[in-house]
Amino acid sequence: MAGSSRRFTDAGYELPKYMLDAHGKSLFRHSVESFSAYFDRELFLFIAREIGATAEFLETELRTLGVKEHQVVMLDAPTSGQAETVVRGLEGAARQAGTDADQPLTIFNIDTFRPSFRYPDLFELGAVDGYLETFIGSGANWSNVVPAEGNEHRVVKTAEKQQISEYCCTGLYYFRSSQRFRALFDAEVKALGASGAETYVAPMYNRLIAHGGDIRYSVIEPKDVIFCGVPAEYEAFLAVEPTS
């Protein structure tokens, strides 16, 4: 929610995309409801910019949803990409809480829906350094993972917007350590130098892998994830009759 929703603005939409309605609910609510199984046991962090009274919108939606523990961090400037957005959000959350405790980190996009999400049971979540959720697909617009030979749902390489395998990422990323994520980001920024390149999350796993990190992946059916990141996807979602 720290982006500008430019493609939606260019298409004539006046509200930020996460405020847009679909089947009687905002896209924000559709996305966050994906994780309703964890509303009473995990801390949720929402990172946004103050566009169109976003802070008030978030608090109203979160009360309606019943998310037990949450923090909202409002950024005052655009970032270089999703990875920096997460880091700035973690820093803001630490300032709010008065502590910088290390904890597991799950990252997800507010314009994507994963109805009835559950963490995978293919491996022990707390024992791996990270995992990426994938589906079988194609196209150079996705992040990808390359599985290890012999599989075991182990990852040997990740890439952003390069078709290096059929395993396309849904945008759900898990790291066992939030502090390690921040260190990985610092290393990524140093490597990018003054190029001004966008900072993506998926390629950061390669640094963990290079140092012996245990990175896994899960696979879901394409029908189990819904994307609304561009106007055409949103309009396609509007055209689908709700199932309940």
Q: Where is each model-derived feature located?
A:
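N-terminal nucleotide-binding beta1-loop-alpha1 segment
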Residues: 1-13
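Short aromatic-hydrophobic micro-motifs that form the base-stacking/packing surface
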Residues: 104-108
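Short beta-strand/turn micro-motifs composed of small residues
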Residues: 1-2, 47-48, 109, 134
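Conserved core of the sugar-phosphate nucleotidyltransferase
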Residues: 113-195
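A structural signal for short hydrophobic beta-strand segments in well-ordered beta-sheet cores
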Residues: 19, 144-148, 217
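Conserved alpha/beta core of the MobA/IspD/sugar-nucleotide pyrophosphorylase nucleotidyltransferase superfamily
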Residues: 168-244
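A short, conserved beta-strand element in the Rossmann-like catalytic core
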Residues: 52, 111-114
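Conserved N-terminal catalytic core of the sugar/cofactor nucleotidyltransferase
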Residues: 7-9, 20-21, 25-103
